[in-house]
Swiss-Prot record:
<dbReference type="GO" id="GO:0001525">
    <property type="term" value="P:angiogenesis"/>
</dbReference>
<dbReference type="GO" id="GO:0016020">
    <property type="term" value="C:membrane"/>
</dbReference>
<dbReference type="InterPro" id="IPR005722">
    <property type="entry name" value="ATP_synth_F1_bsu"/>
</dbReference>
<feature type="modified residue" description="N6-acetyllysine">
    <location>
        <position position="485"/>
    </location>
</feature>
<dbReference type="GO" id="GO:0005743">
    <property type="term" value="C:mitochondrial inner membrane"/>
</dbReference>
<protein>
    <recommendedName>
        <fullName>ATP synthase F(1) complex subunit beta, mitochondrial</fullName>
        <ecNumber>7.1.2.2</ecNumber>
    </recommendedName>
</protein>
<dbReference type="InterPro" id="IPR000194">
    <property type="entry name" value="ATPase_F1/V1/A1_a/bsu_nucl-bd"/>
</dbReference>
<feature type="modified residue" description="N6-succinyllysine; alternate">
    <location>
        <position position="124"/>
    </location>
</feature>
<feature type="modified residue" description="N6-succinyllysine; alternate">
    <location>
        <position position="161"/>
    </location>
</feature>
<dbReference type="InterPro" id="IPR036121">
    <property type="entry name" value="ATPase_F1/V1/A1_a/bsu_N_sf"/>
</dbReference>
<dbReference type="GO" id="GO:0046961">
    <property type="term" value="F:proton-transporting ATPase activity, rotational mechanism"/>
</dbReference>
<keyword id="KW-0325">Glycoprotein</keyword>
<feature type="binding site">
    <location>
        <position position="212"/>
    </location>
    <ligand>
        <name>ADP</name>
    </ligand>
</feature>
<feature type="binding site">
    <location>
        <position position="213"/>
    </location>
    <ligand>
        <name>Mg(2+) 1</name>
    </ligand>
</feature>
<dbReference type="GO" id="GO:0042288">
    <property type="term" value="F:MHC class I protein binding"/>
</dbReference>
<dbReference type="GO" id="GO:0043532">
    <property type="term" value="F:angiostatin binding"/>
</dbReference>
<keyword id="KW-0406">Ion transport</keyword>
Amino acid sequence: MLGFVGRVAAAPASGALRRLTPSASLPPAQLLLRAAPTAVHPVRDYAAQTSPSPKAGAATGRIVAVIGAVVDVQFDEGLPPILNALEVQGRETRLVLEVAQHLGESTVRTIAMDGTEGLVRGQKVLDSGAPIKIPVGPETLGRIMNVIGEPIDERGPIKTKQFAPIHAEAPEFMEMSVEQEILVTGIKVVDLLAPYAKGGKIGLFGGAGVGKTVLIMELINNVAKAHGGYSVFAGVGERTREGNDLYHEMIESGVINLKDATSKVALVYGQMNEPPGARARVALTGLTVAEYFRDQEGQDVLLFIDNIFRFTQAGSEVSALLGRIPSAVGYQPTLATDMGTMQERITTTKKGSITSVQAIYVPADDLTDPAPATTFAHLDATTVLSRAIAELGIYPAVDPLDSTSRIMDPNIVGSEHYDVARGVQKILQDYKSLQDIIAILGMDELSEEDKLTVSRARKIQRFLSQPFQVAEVFTGHMGKLVPLKETIKGFQQILAGEYDHLPEQAFYMVGPIEEAVAKADKLAEEHSS
């Protein structure tokens, strides 16, 4: 790459290279207008969609410059609008370019959706006449595709007649639904303290290695088994190995069935090794697949994005490549716009809903970083994973005091659920405030009432842990899916003091409260023998 830069620097200033220096080719007034406005996308008509290959007679251009993932293409006539997909001709593999800027002199600056190795100036490029189109419909279930809709699971083409552009408008206000309903996940700490709204947006916050991806896998597993719903998983800029593991674990657990058409999930991957263009668009590809199930089949769809931070990071890389001046902490100046354009499409309509769970990597565990902070504005619930809780060996390492939900309201969840949840949070907060005293003076200096608070809080803390079905092979504990009524009942009884006589280790890594009682009996037997 450095060699390429050196060759460009040493080369004579040809017409094509002069175009890279805006001042050499554009008057000052035009410099301010380099980025053309985003095209307005009409409402989708799936039935009318055809295969996304360029049509005969499409506008033809030629490559005039290649700068890493950015390719400049010059057209003699028929300049393609912003966000149109172009296809490079004369290559063994398909290379799609997306128009990002109009530079003047009939030249467009594009972002490549795959590696640009082997591209040469003068190579022919065709305008597809539309944004990137991808296959949608039931045929995508059980399959893995990339950002441009090509299957990457070595199981042949995706046989569907329906294609949809990845760029679309958010639903109109009149189409949206305003009903509130809990999506029961079977995970105690989530259902009790920060319940997910059906059709809402949920953020999974946490640093590296605290269990975001495992929690997402458990949610896919539970929703497929408990609700029978379709899921779409968009792997954005994460490890290829994790994507591969996830696929094989889904096959083993029956979420994906290779023998027939009963698969419950479609996978869309744009992993760490992909160019920034692919990582910046793969979330939209996954969202487009989910929108089809919502709008055409009236489904309640689950959309998982792992990791939404990588979407922002890729946008930052693309922005720098396009020469935009960075804003705070080096992020793109259009950070809020990019995020809002995507998040507003994730919503509940009168036909169906998309509930989105987004893993959010927090750089250096700093929640004030612009990337996680911008995402916060769009969320209905937050599940914050804490390293301090993970260090105690409590998984899922959800912070019960930092995690929030907009629907934690007695009018929506009911007064019993609300009172138990607030009681649990109060006792945990009291325990937190007593920890300094315990650290300095020890437990003996506490009053009897405070000792009881600490005892119950430690039991609650351990009862918030739960063995996951997808982690059975690592933990050796049988995975549990706990109904909401059982969860509320268990915590209500601990708060009431019904289990003050049980040891706290009995509450660790169990499902419903009955299992804690059985575990306590087993521990007592072992101790007596």
